[in-house]
Amino acid sequence: MHRNARGNVPGPSSLRQSIGTTKADRDRDRVPSVDAGAPRTPDTTTSSSTTRHMHHQPHPRNGRQERKCTVTVNESFSRDEVLLNLDLFDNGIKPGSLMAIEVPPEKSGHASLRKMPTQDHLDRDDSSMDASQTGSTTTTDRRYLFIVKDMSKDMKLRHPKVELYVAKHVAEAFGMKKGGHVYLIPEDANNPSIEASHVELSFRDQYLSRADMWRMAVGELSERTVYQGQVIYFLGTCKAQISAVFVDGRKVRSAFFGRHTRPIYRSESARYILFIQMSREMWDFDSDGSGEIMFNKVVNGFLPALFKKWMALKLKHLVSIVLFARVEYDTGISTEFAETALHDSYFTGTQKSGSKRPYKDFYRVVVSEKTSVEWTSILYHLKREFGIFRRDISLHHQQALNPMQSVSEEGATKQPYHRQIRAESSLATHGNFLEAINLASTVYAHDYIDRDLMRTGISVVVISPGAGVFEVDYEELRRTTEALVGNGIGIDLICVPKIPLHSVPLFRYKKVPEKGRRHSEKIKTHFHDGSTPKYHTPAIGSYTSALGSSLSPTKNMSVPPRVESSLMSHASNDEWSYALPQWLHVSYWTGNSDEALSYQGIALSASDNTCQDSQDEFAIRCRMYDLQMRSVLETNEIETTPLHADPSFPRKLIQPLPLAKFRRFDVDGITLIPNLRHTGGLVDHVSGFQKFAPDKHAKPGEKTIWRHLQEYDDTKAHLPASRRHLGFRPQNNADNVRMHGVESGSYLGASMISERRVSINHHQSPHPSVSSKTSSGKTPKFMRQISLGQRGFGIAAPKVAVAEVQVENVAAATSMAAVSGSRSPLPVRMTPIKSNPQTSQSPQALTAIRDSPIAERAQESGRSSRLAPSRPIHIRNNVQSSDSTLFGTVGTMISSSVIRHAGAAPDAPEIKYSNALRAEDAQKVGISKLRAGEMPDQQAILSPSAAVSPWLTVLNPCNPEANKVDETNLYSRWQHVFPQPSEMKVMKWKSLCTPAAVPLTTEHFPTQAQFDSEYQRQPYNVSQEFDDELTEEPKTREELLKELISLRFSQGFQVVVGQAVAKAFGQKQMKIADILSRDHSAEDGTSIFLSVGNTIHQLSCVNGTEVEVNIFTRKPALQASNLEQPEVYKPAIRTIMDEDYVARQIDIATPKPERNWNYIDSYVAGHDLELSESFRFWRARFVLIPIVNRTSLDPAAGEKEEETRIEGTRRLGKLWQKHRYIPPSDRRFQDLGPRHRKDPNPLDIVYKTDDPSVVIAAELETLPLLEGLEAGHRRAQLVTNKHQFRKSSLNLAQLAEAIQQPVENGGVRMQNRRWHLRLHYNCFIGSDMIDWMLDNFEDLDSREEAEALGNVLMISDEDKLKDKEKDKDKEKDKDKEKEGSTRRESGIFVHVEKRHRFKDGQYFYQISSDFAKPQPSTWFNQRWREASVPSTPISEQPPRESIRNSISHTLSEEESLTSGATTPTAPILPYGGNKPRVMLSKVMKYDVDHRKRSYRPERIDLHYDRLHNPDNCYHLRIDWMNVTAKLIEDAVEGWAREASLYGMRLVEVPIAEACTISDVNPFRKPFPIKLAVPPPDRQPVTFYDPTSFSPLAQPARLFYQKAILRKFDFVLDMESASSFPSNVDVTYSWGKPEFKYTQYIHRSGILLAEITDEGDFLILANRLYSNRAQAARDKEMRKEEEQQQHKHRQGGAGAGGNGGLPGHSHVADLTPLSSPLFRAVNTTGSPKTAGQGAAGAGSHGNNIAPGGEHNVHSALIKFSLDEPNSIRLEMEKFCHDPVALEAFYSELLDRAPGPQPASSIMAPTIISQTGSGTGPVADHNIPSFPSGGLPQGLLSSSVAGDGLSVIPSPVQQRVQSPAVLAASQLLRRGSVQY
C-alpha cells in the first residue's frame, strides 16, 4: 500500500523532524518493484533510491504457504531465539531462509498482546499512532520474523516431537504461550514489505562513538531479523535496546534488517544545555493564551513537563541552564557619538538596524551539569533567579561605567552621565540568539579531550519568547553555520507563543554586497513571493523593504526598464534575506497538554498534503488594532493564489517542450535557443513582435494560446455544480530546461543550462536535458547552475565564469567513453585542471548546443535526475571586462538566448526566428512573476551567498511553496533520522528526551556544477605497512578500508548514499560499496564517499592493495570588507558561583585547524607514527588519590596504608604489563635477554617521599630517570663469572660477590636511599634483586620463585638470636666459629630495619656485614654519581622527539635566571654539557581487549608516572584513536576496582589546569578565595638536604596556603612548570609541563584547587567525576563509617587512644575522603598536648592543622556526603575569618621544634638496630599512618609492615613525652615540602 494513499499519519517525534516525504521516498515511487528472485549485489549501487518502498502488502493467509505449529518455549538461556525441527517439515524449508511466525488473536477478540517488562518503557511516548498503524495487530503486532535454523541432533533426540522451539523472551514479547498454536509462513528476504526502513536503538550509561554504532549495526543487526524490545550486545559489553522498528514509515514489531535499513541511535544519558532567552517579551503577558507571564509558562509549564518525562523514562541526563539576554542602551545622544562618548570597550556591539543602539550581551549560569533527578531544585533556582535577573542586567552598566566616568563640574546638581543611560532588554528578534548557540558549540567543540566514557550525545535547547524569527548578522550566521554542520550537536528551539503564519525558524539578515563588483552589477533583482534561491544566487530569496514599501516585492515590479538603477542601488542597502537553517528545528509549546508540542518546520502551505481542517478552518489571528476594527482584509497580494497554481489552469501551456519539439535554428550565423524560463508577468517584454498576435504564426491543427486562455476564462466564469477539494497534484514540469541570455555591449555571454528536479513531487516523468559536445575536443566555457523548480526559488541569470585559479579545481569526470556510448561503471580518475590565461572568443567554445548521447540515454533510462554531460569545466584566469556581463533591469529579460558566432551579423530578420519565438511565447503566459538573480564569478573563494547556501534554504517566508522545499538540503545531516513524513502538526517528546546521534548515512551531495566550481581536490594513496617478517598477520585491504571508514565515522563523517554521487560525476551508475553489508568485498574500482560539513572524502580501492583517498574541500568563504563584526566577542557572564557579571573576551571567529588526513591515515595503516595534536585524538586523564583504608588485604602481614598503596600501584603495574602490547619491531630486542625475560618487572616506578620538583632539585645525580642512562639496557650485562647460578648449588660467597659488582658488570644497583628523613646507605630494593635473580639464575621462571629464593637468602630471626647469645659467650671460640659458619650459610642480606622478610617491591635491603665489601674511607660524604636504573621494559622508549633530541645528562652551564626561592635549582655537576632531560612518565601500548572479544586490534596509549610519592596522586593518561570506547571503560573500571582494594580512588580529572577552564567552557570559571589576613613572613625550618643531617632554612613560598589546603583534605595533583629546576629539562611522555599554578585535588575527587602567585585560592568543581562503579562501594563505605563512628563515640576512643584530636581517627575512620595528612602521630594522652602536637603537622603533612576548637570533624563528614559547594563554603568561611587565620598561623609557628642532634638518629650504620619499643621511629622505609585507619590487630604488632616503623601500642603512646612527639613530627617529612 502506497504511503500517499493513507491519511495523515502522526508519527513519533524525532530530534530532527522532517517536513515531508524524503527524497528517497519519492525516488522509490518511481523505481519499478524489485524482483524477488533478482540477485543482490551489495557492492554496486545505482543512482536509484537508497530505501525500497513497500509495494506489496502480505497476501491473505489462505493464499500463502503456511503451516500450523505448536510452540515449545525454551525456559533456559539460549543464544538461538527460534529453532525448527526440519525433520518434521517438508523439503520446502531450508536453513537460512526467512520465515514469519504469526500469532493468532486471542479468543476474546482483542488483539492486545502481552508485553515484555520493558515494553511500557518503549511505547510510553508512542501513543499518537493512528488506526492505520495499530489496527492490524494480527499481521503486524503479533508477527515475528526469523531465520530458519535446524535443531541439533542432541535436541532432536531429547525432544523428538518438538516442531518449534522459541526462546522465552521472544515468546513473552509476542504473546506466544507454551503449547499454543502459531502459523509459520515463508517470506522473501527481498520483499520490501518485510525489510525495515529504520530501526531505532536506545542506550545509556556508556559512550558509543559513531564508529561503534556502525560496527554494531554491521556485526549484530545486518542481515538479521529484529524486533521491538530486543536487547543487543555488541562485543559482549556494548548494550543497546531496539525501541522501534519501521517498515516504510509504518511502525511494526518485527522486520528484517537489510542493506537499505537505516539505524537510528538515541542516548538516554546525554548532556543537555538549556538556554532561556530573557528578552523583553519574557515579562509580557500571554495575550493570546492563558494570560500568564511568559516566563511562568516556561518554568511552570514546559520545564516541569520535560523533567517529568525524563523521570518517567528513567533517563540520566546532565543538565546545564543558562539565561541569556541582550540589553540595549538609550544613551540620549546620536548613534555616531554613543560609543565614543561612552566607553566602547564596555559594549558588545551596536545594533546593525532598527534603533542602532549600543548593546551588551549577558549570560547567567543558573545550573551547571546537574543530574536530571534534581529537577525540583533546578526549578527553584530558576524561579529565584527570575526575580533578580532583570534588575542585575539593567543596573550593571552603572557599576561597570562608574570608575570610567568623571562627574562634571556641576556634579553637585547633575547626575553622572552613566546614570542617565536607560537600559532595556531587546526584543527576541534582535537578541543574541546566534551568539548563544555559538558559545554552546564552543563548549562541546573539544569533546574528544577529557572524554566522558559514561555519556553519549550533546543537545542544545533554546527556549525563546519570540515567534522564531531572528535578525542576525550575516558573518555571524555563516560562522555559526560552519561550526554546527561539522559536529553532531543538535539544536532545538522551543518557542512559547503560538505558531506564526509564516515559515519558521527564520533568520533575517542584511544582504552582503559582493566584493569588487561594479555599480551596475550590484543591481539586485526582485523575487516573487515564492521565490527561493540557488546556490550561486547572491540575492537569494530577497525582497526589498526600502522606502517604507510593503514587504511584498511585487509592488516594486512596475518600475520601468532601465530607469530604476539608482533606486535599486539605494534599495540594496536595506535589502534583507530570509533563510531556514538545516541545523535548527523549532517546536511550539502550547501549554494545553503535557503530552504534545505543536510543531512547525515550514509554513503549513509547504506541506505536500495538508489536512482538510487546516485549509477550510483557518484560524484568524491579528494583533493590529486597525485591522481588528475593520476586520481582516479579504484579499491581499500574498494570499492571492497565482494563476498557474489553480487546478483548472491548462498545465500544458507552461510545461516544457518535449525533446523532439525543442526547436533550434541557425540562421545567418545566429544560434537561437528558446527560453523555457517563466518570465516576469506584467512587465516582461516579448522580443520579435510589434504587437501581440497569438494566431499569426499558428500551425494548422494546433490550438493557439489564445484559445487556451479563452477556455480557461470560460471555465472560471461558471460556478461548479458541487465543490470538491482538490489536493496537491504533482506536476510534470519540474525538469524544465531554462535558458536565458544577458546583454552585452560587444558580444553576449555563454548561455547557461539550469535544471533541477522538483524535490517533493511524487510522480515525475523523465525529461531529457540539453547537453553539448565540442567540435574540436576543447571544452566550452560553461558553468552549470541549479534551479529549484517552477515557482519560488528563481532562476539564476548566467554570466561567463571567470576566476583566479590558485588551487586545483575539481572537474567532473571526463569520460569520452560516456560520450561515445560506453557504460563503464568506474569513475574516470579526476585530474587537476591547469588554467591558462585566455579569452573566451574561441569559436569552438561557442558552438551550438546539440543533443548528446547522454541526453538520449537519459531519456531511455527512465530517471528524472539531472544528467550532466561528461566533460570538465575549464575556468579562465583572466578577469572579464566589465562590459562583458550586464544584467537587464528588473522584470525584463531577453526572450531568447542568442549566442553569436565570430563574425556573425549583428541583426537578423524577425521572420527568420519567429517560429522559435512562438515556442518561447508559449512559456510567457501570465504566470507567477519569477525574477532572475545574477551568478557570481567563479573565484578561488566563495561569495557570501554561496558560502551558506548548502546549509540555509533561503525563501520568502510568507508564501513558500510545497514543491520547492528539498529536505535533502534542508535536513541534510539529519534526513535519515526521520522514519516518517511529518504531515502532522503535533510532535512528541522524543527529541527532547532521547537525542539522536548524527545518522551514519546521508543523501546530501553537491550538484555537478557545485562540485566542479566550488571544490578543490587533494589526492593521496594509503597502503598497509608491512615490516618484513616482524609484522603480525597483515590486514587485508578490506580491513584497512574498514578502519579508514571507522575513523571518519568517529570524526563526524557520513556515508553518502543514493543517486547524488552518480549525478555529480555525470554517470548513470557507480560502483559504491555497501557499508551495512557483512560480506561486501573491496574490489578495485569500488568507492565510498563520506562527507562532513564542507569536506568530502572519496575512498577508492586501487592497485590491488592500496586505497586512494581524494579529499574535496570547499573553497573558503569570502570575507566582506565592509563587515564590522569584531573578531573578539565581549559578553558579560556570571557563572554559577560568581557574585556579579564579569566582562569576558571570547574568540569565536578563529576556525579550527584542519586535520592532516594523510598523516592520520598513515597512522591507521600501521606506519610507526605518533599521535599529534592535529589528529584530534581522544584523551582522558585519571588520578589515583590516596584514601584511608579500614582493612588490610593481609592483616597478618601487618602492612600499613602507605605500604598498601605502593603494593596497589605495583599490582596495577603488573596488570598493565600483562596486557601490554609490544610492537613486532621491539619484540626482537625483548627476546635478547636470558630466557627472553619471561616475567619482566612491572614498570619500575621510582618511589620517593618528596614531590617531583624537590626530588629533581635534590637528587638529580642519583635519579634513575635521566635520559641517556636507560639506553644501555642494564639486563644485557650479566655477571662476570661467565656462568649462571642454580638454586640447587648455591655458593653464598660467590653470589654475594656477584650481587655487589658494579652495575655495568652485571651487579645489583647499590646506593644511598632516603625514605622520609632516614638515609639508608649502600642498599638495594627488592624489585631490583628480583630482576637480577631472574637474569642470573637458570632455574627461576617467575617473580614468585625469585621472591621465595630471596627469603632463603635472608638472615632469619633465629640467626639474630644466635648472634646475641654468641656475643655473651665469648670464651667458647670453637662454638663461635662453628656458629659463624652456620650463619654464613643461612643468608647474605637483611632488611634495613630487620623487620621484614624479602619482598618484591619498594623495600630496602642491605648486604650483611659478613659479606659486605668494605667501602672507601671517604664514602660517607660522597654523593654517588651513579644513577639508579630500574628495570624498565625494553620497548618502552621516550617519544621520538626525545630520541631525536637526545642530549647529554649533564647540567647546563648557563646561569639560572630564576630565584631559588621560587624555583628549585639542581646543583651544578662537575661535567659540562646541555641540560639533562628527565622523563617523569612513560608510555606503553595497552591492549584493552585482552579477552579478544573484538575482531580488530583495540589498543590505547597508556601514560604512567615513573616518579611517585605515595602521599600524592598517581597520574594516568590514556590516548586513543579508532578504539571501542566501551572496552576502554571496562578496563578503567577494572583498574578502579583493583585500586580501591589498596587504598586508592581512581578519578577522572581535566587534562588542563583549573585556571584555564574558561578558555574551553565560557560558562565555567574557578571561584577565587582570598585570605582575610595575609600570612606572616616567618616560616618554620622544614628543608632537608639528602646529604646533610640538620635542617636548612629555605624561604618556601606559599607555605601557609599549602597548609590550609592540607587542612581541608587536599593532596598534590600536578606541580606547576615553574616548580621544577630551571636548569633541568623536565618532560612527560605527553609533553612539557604546562601548568601555571600547582594544582591540588580533594581526596573525594570532586574538587580541584590551585594557589595563585598572589597567594589566593582558585576552587573548581571536577565535573568529570562520575564513577558508576564506585557509587555502590561508596555507599557501603559510608554505612560502615557511620557504624565505626558510633562505636568510637561509645568507647571514648577520641580522648584516649587518639588524643582527642578533632578530625583525627574519627574522620579517618568515618570517610574515605579523609586524608592521611589529617592524622596524629603517636600523641600523648593529654588533650592539650595532643592539640599542640597535631598543630605541628602543618609543616610536615602528617596531621590535621591547628584549631582544636574548629570543628573540622563535622565539616569533613559533610564533605563526604554533599556536593563540592559544601567544601567550598567551609573553606571560604575559614579563609574569611581573621581570628581563625591568626590562630592557624601562630600555632604553625609555635609548634615547629628546633633542630635535633643528627647523630642520635642519623648515625651511619649498615644495619639499623632500632627496636619497636624505644619510641617513635622517624627514619623508616615507609611512613607511619594513623592508628585509626588500621585494624586493631596491627596496632599491637611489633612487625607492622616492610620498611615501616612500628606504630606503638596505646600503652606506649601514653608514656611518651611531648618533646619526643615534637621531634618525631619534625623529623618525619611530609608529602609536600615547603
From Swiss-Prot:
Residues 1-68, 106-136, 1363-1386, 1671-1749 are annotated as: Disordered. Transmembrane segments: none annotated. It is a peripheral membrane protein. Keywords: Membrane, Vacuole. Residues 52-62 have a biased composition (Basic residues). It comes from Pyricularia oryzae (strain 70-15 / ATCC MYA-4617 / FGSC 8958) (Rice blast fungus). Residues 1304-1383 form the DEP domain. This is Vacuolar membrane-associated protein IML1. Its main location: membrane. GO terms for biological process: intracellular signal transduction; negative regulation of TORC1 signaling; positive regulation of autophagy. It is found in: Vacuole membrane. Belongs to the IML1 family. It holds the Pfam family DEPDC5_CTD. Gene3D superfamilies: Winged helix-like DNA-binding domain superfamily/Winged helix DNA-binding domain (1.10.10.10). GO terms for cellular component: GATOR1 complex; vacuolar membrane.
